Amino acid sequence: MRIAPLAAALLLLAAGCHSAFIEATISNRTPDTLTLVEVDYPSASFGTQTLASGQDFHYRFKVLGSGPTSILWTDATHHDHKSTGPSLQESDEGTLTVAITPTNPTWTFQPINKK
């Protein structure tokens, strides 16, 4: 009788657990250093104090809830900027890239395992 619970536990371990997450990259494609870079997504945010020209910032997060994304940053002349990105759903998984350029940021969301 002890074998059945043990076998069930091993079966669950073998099947593995998978948690949906977003692998995000913020890229500074401007000629100047950006400061106070923040990405807002449903239920949380992340960011970095500075992002040098040509530098990338990587962050991995889990989406809890649903809603839009946005990015805020301050340029070298101390002007604040905001750009709205794609909406995310709680089950979303994939990569999110934001390339900040001298004109406008470019957002790319590539979902995987979309249900």
Predicted regions and their residues:
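Bacterial N-terminal signal peptides
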Residues: 5-15
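Bacterial signal peptide processing site
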Residues: 16-20
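Intrinsic-disorder/low-complexity, polar/charged segments enriched in Ser/Thr/Lys/Arg/Asp/Glu/Gln
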Residues: 21-23, 56-58, 95
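Asparagine-centered strand-capping/turn motif at beta-strand->loop junctions
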Residues: 24-31
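Short loop/turn positions at the edges of beta-strands in beta-sheet-rich folds
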Residues: 30, 63-65, 92
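Post-signal-peptide N-terminal segment of Sec-exported extracytoplasmic proteins
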Residues: 36-82, 108-110
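Extracellular beta-sheet/turn segments enriched in Thr/Pro/Gly and aliphatic residues
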Residues: 80, 86-115
